[in-house]
Regions:
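Short histidine-centered beta-strand/loop micro-motifs
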Residues: 34-36, 54-60, 101-103
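Short, conserved beta-strand element in jelly-roll/cupin
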Residues: 48-49, 59-75
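Ligand-binding loop in jelly-roll beta-barrel domains
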Residues: 94-120
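Short acidic-glycine-tyrosine-enriched beta hairpin
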Residues: 79-94
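A short, N-terminal "cap"/entry segment at the start of jelly-roll beta-barrel domains
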Residues: 1-41, 46, 125-129
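Structural motif
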Residues: 65, 72-74, 81, 97, ...
């Protein structure tokens, strides 16, 4: 955790994503930007994708959950197209190829959680499909 986060909250167990430096979350695989934190076993991030932008087809070796806080995500996964609206959780099974794009109506902000098993084994956490 950054010193800024610990100082602002005054508690090493309280993570303030809004005070953390923002960066690209998946590099060239996605337009998503935000702040993230690695626990011992779980990765967590607060991500924003600008309207109409998002990820290329990719997969993660570990199970992932995205909870949409604002806006909506258009998703293509498992041969289906669907929308994940505000207030809904999007579950991505391990190794499932997916694409997630903010709808044209506005930016999408979501919390992401992913286990870190593969990362701790030295495997890439994201692979383009």
């Amino acid at each position: 955790m950054s010193a800024t986060t610990a100082t602002k909250t005054g508690n090493k167990y309280v993570i303030d994503f809004h005070s953390m430096e923002k960066s690209s979350i998946l590099g060239k695989t996605s337009t998503g930007e935000g702040a993230s934190f690695n626990g011992d076993r779980i990765y967590c991030g607060l991500v924003t994708k600008k309207k109409g932008t998002g990820s290329k087809a990719h997969f993660h070796p570990d199970e992932t959950f995205n909870y949409v806080l604002k806006g909506a995500l258009k998703v293509h996964m498992d041969g289906m197209d669907f929308v994940v609206p505000t207030g809904c959780l999007f579950h991505i099974p391990a190794n499932m190829v997916h694409i997630a794009v903010a709808t044209e109506e506005g930016d999408a902000t979501y919390l992401v959680w992913r286990d870190r098993v593969a990362e701790k084994q030295g495997k890439p956490i994201t692979t383009e499909a």
